[in-house]
């Protein structure tokens, strides 16, 4: 195997060239000395120079001889090395082949499954219409057969089903009756209490209705009396305002005394003042102040007397 081309080879060649150049220069110098000196002196110097050159070139010569030996060894072992490389390549290829065979053996089922899956997909795609048609046909036949079987089962078990339904209905009614009885037993006291309360309310309502029927005339009379009192109070206020107005105008020519009738005094004053301008003003005042017109009750003098007694004396009411 050759060792040329290494990084140290260039440096070694440069060193050898430098040594060769030095030897050439020395030989040239030695030649000049030979021309000038004696033969003995020249031989001595030449021998010394050659020894120096030999000593200097000995490593180079040794390296060169070693290189030649190595080249001879390389040439001798070249076939063995080539064979070794070939054997290594063969061994590597054999190992690689074994690894590939192992990988193939490992992945063969996957590859087979994948190829088989692709084939099955192709077959499915090709036979899918026929498969669908056959599936639909089988489904129709199966549904028809199932319908027949179900009808036969229904016809066979119809009586049992009806009997079971009736039994369940009876059981449900019995359970419901028990629950209702339990509820009735639980709520019986409350229902009785509610009935008693309802009866008490009914009797109380009847009593209240009787009381209302008994007190209705009195209540109506009390309402009428209250209304009459309100109307009398309004009439009294109106008469008082009229008397005050007449008194302010100086048209009151009658001195009111405790025994003087308030209505008569006011009526006379109004009649005297407004005579000829208004139609019967005294009549209007009398109509307003008359208790028989306002209340629709008899004995107006008694009502007016009671009002006058409540207001105080006529002179106090008129402010004179």
Curated annotation (Swiss-Prot):
It is found in: Secreted. One of its GO terms (molecular function) is actin filament binding. One of its GO terms (cellular component) is symbiont-containing vacuole. Residues 191-251 form a coiled coil. Transmembrane segments: none annotated. One of its GO terms (biological process) is biological process involved in interaction with host. Residues 1-28 form the signal peptide. It comes from the Bacteria. Keywords: Coiled coil, Secreted, Signal. Associates with actin filament appendages that are formed in the inclusion appendages of the parasitophorous vacuole during infection of the host erythrocyte. This is Appendage-associated protein. It comes from Anaplasma marginale (strain Virginia).
